[in-house]
Structure formats: C-alpha cells, structure tokens
C-alpha cells in the first residue's frame, strides 16, 4: 500500500442502510504498533453518511493480481482515496462467539497478532464471511496450518487459519455462510481455534472494528 494516498484515506463501512466513514487514523492508529507504512495516517472522525451506490465488484478497484500460492503477495496495490466496504450480508464464520485472543501486539512473542482467535472445536463448520472467490488453499506448518484465503466482492480479503480440513478449492466461488473448512488445531497453535483475519490490499484491519462478534452481526 502506497503512503502517498494513505494520508487522505477514507474508508466507508456500509451496513444496515448507513455508512460509517473512517477518514484515517483511528482505524489504523488504534491497532498500534502497526506496519511502519501506515504510521503516517491522518487523525479521523467517525460519522454516519447516507447510503451510496457501490460497484458490483469494488475489489476490482484495488487488486491487480491473483496469486494463489501466498497469503500476502501484495506490494503495489493502492486503495482509492475513498472506498466503500459493504458489510451487508456478513455471516459469522464460526458457531462460537467467544474471542480468545484479540488483534494487537503480543509482547511475549514480540510480534503483532494480525487477526482474532475465535474458540472452536475440531470439526466445527467454518463458513465464508461474505460472498467471494477462494484465492488460496494451502498448508503453513509454522503459522496458519491449513488455511483458506477468500477475496470478497466488497474489497476485503478474509483468512481462516488452523483448519483441520479445507472444504473448498482455488478459484471456487462461495456465498456468505457457505462452509469453507472445519475448525482445528493445525500449524502454530496451542489449542483448537479459528484464526480470522480481515485485510484490505494486504493491510490488516482489526475485525472487531468491522463486526460485532457477540451479536454475530456488523
């Protein structure tokens, strides 16, 4: 992501008939410490805005590649100065609402935890959060274990890690709520859970800024 535009980055989260406009830093700064490329984002306001028309596939505005072998291949993608993330149609990816580890810096490991860990049992059904297309289905022994990456038509990509089994294949189109894997304990983990990430052009966004997990809604 190029910082030439990030200072004026405006993200709108469209949900339930209104948009929440995020003009910069609270979305990113509250995640601190974050990737050094994002530390210069301007201070923000959160406001309601009228619903607006959106593209059928806003992700086409962002991504210029389709890499099926890496979770994080992005180097040059740029987000428009104003971009609407349509959160309508969200499906809770797990049967559980229990977040066991939150997004943020982990002093004990000296690294960022760039997603949420949600309690699941091995074999629990994991579903796609939105409509989209499967980009990656792989195994990462030192990290995600069995994982799936889905690019959604709203511009987000979601990552589902530590699965016991993947139920989808690369280039498969999926609907929100459609099973994509089974919960598990593969990869670098200390117990059965789902590691869930939300990213825009490769940059992690705290899923709890987007979704209300206790309510299983946006």
Predicted regions and their residues:
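Generic structural motif
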Residues: 97-99, 124-134, 174-177
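Short glycine/threonine/proline-enriched tight-turn/helix- or strand-capping micro-motif at secondary-structure
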Residues: 80-85, 98-127
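A generic structural motif
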Residues: 103, 122, 138, 164-167, ...
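Short polar/acidic secondary-structure junctions
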Residues: 106-108, 123-125, 139-141, 185-188, ...
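Conserved positions in beta-strands of structured domains
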Residues: 100, 119, 133-135, 164, ...
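Zn2+-dependent peptidoglycan hydrolase active-site motif and core
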Residues: 111-114, 128-167, 197
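Polar/charged, compositionally biased leader and regulatory segments
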Residues: 2-103, 218
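Conserved, short, structured surface segments that act as functional micro-motifs
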Residues: 146-152, 170-218
């Amino acid at each position: 992501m190029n910082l030439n535009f990030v200072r004026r980055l405006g993200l709108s989260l469209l949900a339930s008939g209104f948009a929440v406009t995020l003009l910069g830093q609270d979305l990113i700064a509250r995640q601190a410490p974050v990737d050094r490329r994002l530390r210069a984002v301007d201070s923000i306001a959160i406001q309601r805005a009228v619903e607006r028309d959106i593209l059928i596939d806003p992700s086409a505005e962002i991504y210029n590649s389709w890499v099926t072998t890496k979770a994080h291949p992005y180097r040059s993608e740029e987000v428009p100065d104003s971009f609407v993330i349509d959160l309508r149609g969200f499906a809770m990816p797990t049967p559980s609402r229990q977040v066991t580890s939150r997004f943020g810096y982990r002093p004990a490991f000296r690294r960022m935890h760039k997603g949420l860990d949600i309690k699941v049992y091995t074999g629990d059904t994991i579903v796609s959060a939105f409509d989209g297309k499967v980009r990656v289905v792989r195994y990462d022994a030192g990290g995600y274990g069995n994982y799936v990456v889905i690019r959604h038509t709203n511009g987000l990509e979601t990552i589902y890690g530590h699965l016991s089994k993947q139920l989808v294949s690369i280039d498969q189109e999926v609907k929100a709520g459609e099973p994509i894997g089974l919960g598990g304990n593969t990869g670098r983990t200390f117990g059965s859970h789902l590691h869930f990430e939300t990213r825009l052009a490769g940059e992690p966004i705290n899923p709890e800024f987007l979704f209300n997990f206790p309510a299983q809604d946006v």
